[in-house]
Amino acid sequence: MSNITIYHNPTCGTSRNTLEMIRNSGNEPTVIYYLETPPTHDELVKLIADMGITVRALLRKNVEPYEELGLAEGTFSDEQLIGFMLEHPILINRPIVVTPLGTRLCRPSEVVLDILPEPQQGAFTKEDGEKITDESGKRLK
């Protein structure tokens, strides 16, 4: 069993790039398709605390429920926002990666490199052609 977990959306390029960087470090993570299997309330609260971000910082803003629910207004408590995220998992920004070195919202995807226990094992180029590591696994940016 892997000691790395990714909350993943396979339709998201950032999430796909993050997953491939984890694999490029020689690790096969536990993949949680969070739209199908959202975290529990307690899991989501822990993820937010472990990332050291606000609840609002985890909210996706460019999705339908954000507008429909009026979430741009600052009138909702953290607990209410968490409830909306659990009811509409598409509101949870992604990918979230948990490793022994920390928990991060990996936007941009190369943020994952800061918390991987093993280095990249070779060159990595994102889907859009941006080079992230060279042939020796050294970070380029």
From Swiss-Prot:
It comes from Yersinia enterocolitica. Involved in resistance to arsenate. Catalyzes the reduction of arsenate [As(V)] to arsenite [As(III)]. Belongs to the ArsC family. It catalyses: [glutaredoxin]-dithiol + arsenate + glutathione + H(+) = glutathionyl-S-S-[glutaredoxin] + arsenite + H2O. Residues 125-141 have a biased composition (Basic and acidic residues). The active site is at 12 (nucleophile). InterPro entries: Arsenate_reductase, Arsenate_reductase-like, Thioredoxin-like_sf. The record marks 8, 60, 94, 107 as: Important for activity. This is Arsenate reductase. Residues 122-141 are annotated as: Disordered. It is an enzyme of class 1 (oxidoreductase). It comes from the Bacteria. GO terms for biological process: response to arsenic-containing substance. SUPFAM superfamilies: Thioredoxin-like. Its EC number is 1.20.4.1. One of its GO terms (molecular function) is arsenate reductase (glutaredoxin) activity. PROSITE patterns: ARSC. Keywords: Arsenical resistance, Oxidoreductase, Plasmid, Transposable element.
